Amino acid sequence: MEIRAAEISKVIKDQIASFGTEAQVSEVGSVLSVGDGIARIHGLDKVQAGEMVEFSNGVKGMALNLEADNVGVVIFGSDSEIKEGDVVKRTGTIVDVPVGKGLLGRVVDALGNPIDGKGPIVDATRQRVEVKAPGIIPRKSVHEPVQTGLKAIDALVPVGRGQRELIIGDRQTGKTAVAIDTFINQKAVNAGTDEGKKLYCIYVAVGQKRSTVAQIVRQLEENGAMEYSIVVAATASEPAPLQYLAPYTGATMGEFFRDNGMHAVIVYDDLSKQAVAYRQMSLLLRRPPGREAYPGDVFYLHSRLLERAAKMNDENGAGSLTALPIIETQAGDVSAYIPTNVISITDGQIFLETGLFYQGIRPAINVGLSVSRVGSSAQTKAMKKVAGSIKLELAQYREMAAFAQFGSDLDASTQKLLNRGARLTELLKQPQFSPLGFEEQTCVIFAGTQGYLDAVPVNRVTEYEAELLSFLRSQHADLLGLIRDTKDLGDEAKGKLVAALDAFAKQFA
């Protein structure tokens, strides 16, 4: 076989020409110490604040403290497999999670990984978790209602699409129940095809027991609400960094709907536990503690989260994200640090009281302390017309009831006020998982404020309401349809309603 020098030199020249000098450079560091969900890393000199890093066993972390000689990283997962000396890589990315309609009906963890055993998530894109809230110009004032299906809320503290309404109260006062009822009540609007009317639901569980989360998922499934809901769970047994991250993950999933001209409501249950998780992380990272040992930026923790709930203007798709954050108080102390912070950030609060709960007034809403800073602009015209007087009557009733305990000889007008107030209070009670449409609420509250209940004994008010609703549904469905379609209680509807109530009064005895 003949060897030609020219051919050999050509092969060598070709190889030299195609020789790549680019080496794969990735900046790495090594673990100095690890424990309690925090790792100290040596190296990674060019890492950026908030950047994701990856440990040698595949667990991800986020760089939060950039110090002169080391980097403080919070670990999104178990730290038991990580040991001193392990290699840590920069990823060059910021925490992102899957978003989109493919998440509806699913239960995911704080990083968006499915934990419900239903396989991988399809039809989803990825979006960054930490984004700036919309500015002032792209927003619009809140004007469409979120129908919670609870008379006490829809009549007295209405919530609008794009509002942030705090639900605050002690443990076991029914805070989560209010949120779950709101989800269940969206079944009717979500059954339609109009994306402008639908309201998708996101539930973020922070530091809850796993059994509690499983129970909530079961309740949503049994009531047919899971198909338009997403559950993000960072339970009590998960590391603090995941409990800190979960609300932002939920907000990112909600922003997908908001920015695409759709509507979503998100419940953070609860932000007290997120603040505790953040305090734990901050103290372990050796950040200086402030009041109640919370770090100085705990206000910013919640404000940047809740500012992402907004109503967008028509040029930006007219979508909305409504936030219902939950705060748990200790012995009714709303003047503690975290409750006052969140009250000042939100557009109103629904205040639930243990005393009312044990008296059997459920939902246990303290009507005097609960406010909505959006007010009647988030109500339908029909509800606005009937709910205006109920607020005043209940306020007068509370004032009088305090005095009436001392005096026995009350004049007729005071007695009438007390009788009416007792019946209205009874009327606002509602069992769990039985939300009402606004047209039914309108009729019931109209009956209460127009004196139809004055002759009914207090202990029969609930019975009166149930029978009235079945009477209206069976014999006056056209009236309910008229109120539902016009969203108003015009002269025609009012005349029909008065006639129906008069007819019902004769048969209810």
From Swiss-Prot:
Catalytic activity, reaction form: ATP + H2O + 4 H(+)(in) = ADP + phosphate + 5 H(+)(out)
Superkingdom: Bacteria
EC primary class: translocase
Required for activity (site feature) positions: S370
Keyword Ion transport appears in the UniProt entry: yes
GO molecular function per UniProt: ADP binding; ATP binding; proton-transporting ATP synthase activity, rotational mechanism
InterPro entries (alphabetical): ATP_synth_asu-like_sf, ATP_synth_asu_C, ATP_synth_asu_C_sf, ATP_synth_F1_a_nt-bd_dom, ATP_synth_F1_asu, ATPase_a/bsu_AS, ATPase_F1/V1/A1_a/bsu_N, ATPase_F1/V1/A1_a/bsu_N_sf
GO cellular component: plasma membrane; proton-transporting ATP synthase complex
UniProt-listed SUPFAM superfamilies: C-terminal domain of alpha and beta subunits of F1 ATP synthase (SSF47917), N-terminal domain of alpha and beta subunits of F1 ATP synthase (SSF50615), P-loop containing nucleoside triphosphate hydrolases (SSF52540)
Keyword terms, alphabetized: ATP synthesis, ATP-binding, Cell inner membrane, Cell membrane, CF(1), Hydrogen ion transport, Ion transport, Membrane, Nucleotide-binding, Translocase, Transport
Bilayer disposition of the protein: Peripheral membrane protein
Keyword Aminoacyl-tRNA synthetase belongs to the record: no
Binding-site residues, ATP: G169, D170, R171, Q172, T173, G174, K175, T176
EC number: 7.1.2.2
UniProt subcellular location: Cell inner membrane
Cysteines joined through disulfide linkages: none
Similarity-based family: Belongs to the ATPase alpha/beta chains family.
Complex formation: F-type ATPases have 2 components, CF(1) - the catalytic core - and CF(0) - the membrane proton channel. CF(1) has five subunits: alpha(3), beta(3), gamma(1), delta(1), epsilon(1). CF(0) has three main subunits: a(1), b(2) and c(9-12). The alpha and beta chains form an alternating ring which encloses part of the gamma chain. CF(1) is attached to CF(0) by a central stalk formed by the gamma and epsilon chains, while a peripheral stalk is formed by the delta and b chains.
Function: Produces ATP from ADP in the presence of a proton gradient across the membrane. The alpha chain is a regulatory subunit.
NCBIfam families, alphabetized: atpA, PRK13343.1
Record-given protein name: ATP synthase subunit alpha
Organism: Novosphingobium aromaticivorans (strain ATCC 700278 / DSM 12444 / CCUG 56034 / CIP 105152 / NBRC 16084 / F199)
